[in-house]
């Protein structure tokens, strides 16, 4: 099901009604039915929500991520606008999962992502459970074609490579993708040994996945992480980036399905986002697993909104470096 964008969520402080240097996101956002989009020349981005936590339910996690797209957009609304005035940012609404129809909703998400990419609009997808990533992948693959070598970088505490004989969930997506698509590679950053069984490590190794443990990602070791990322990227024509908020320490992101006591510092995640988005191969981004129902003082929601803004700013900086605008 598709929900058109709603102006009511785009409200906030107004420091000036005329000076664009004082504007906030809610003063610049454009609402657009995804069926009405037209091809853009450059500097166009779209926020697309995926209201779904059926995959989390199937994976025996804490439900509530269904509500995240609306809440993250509300938090984004009041952030300062740090993009050039000519930059276009659309809210194109939400794809929703109703009646437990996960697979159908992922298909519809894929169609929406494909439409954005094919109209030269960079998608920023706001989930939802991490089952969002499978729908995101479907759209990227449809947009770039089956012969394009596609790399997936997942910033996550978990491999999400469980068996799926009983059906897909928020813990199976990357195994599904690797089984279905011979032109895909998978890199996971932030893996928690205590969040993955020995069998899942064996699965990741058997599938030839690249991964970096959480304890190996510090400010002192970021350069080594960048080298690993570069080695991975060089094998692919296109990248999609996905961020699961449970990769962060529970003190920074308590509002997730599976909180992590040994998670990453937000500054590490921010550095990884900036670095990966700076690469010309990266064409889309999703952020998942915010659970507003268990959040503390909207802390996780605010952090997710900040990461979305970081993504937008650094996608634009890369485009500006390439085009001079």
From Swiss-Prot:
GO molecular-function term, one example from the UniProt record: agmatinase activity
Cofactors demanded by this protein: Mn(2+)
Cofactor binding: number and manner: Binds 2 manganese ions per subunit.
Reactions catalysed according to its record: N-formimidoyl-L-glutamate + H2O = formamide + L-glutamate
InterPro entries in UniProt: HutG, Ureohydrolase, Ureohydrolase_dom_sf
Enzyme class: hydrolase
Residues the entry annotates as binding Mn(2+) 1: 130, 156, 160, 244
The keyword Metal-binding is assigned to this record: yes
GO biological process terms on file: L-histidine catabolic process to glutamate and formamide; L-histidine catabolic process to glutamate and formate; putrescine biosynthetic process from arginine, via agmatine
UniProt pathway: Amino-acid degradation; L-histidine degradation into L-glutamate; L-glutamate from N-formimidoyl-L-glutamate (hydrolase route): step 1/1
Chain positions recorded as Mn(2+) 2 binding sites: 156, 158, 244, 246
EC number: 3.5.3.8
Keywords per UniProt: Histidine metabolism, Hydrolase, Manganese, Metal-binding
Role played: Catalyzes the conversion of N-formimidoyl-L-glutamate to L-glutamate and formamide.
Family statement drawn from the similarity comment of this UniProt entry: Belongs to the arginase family.
Record-given protein name: Formimidoylglutamase
Species this chain originates from: Geobacillus sp. (strain WCH70)
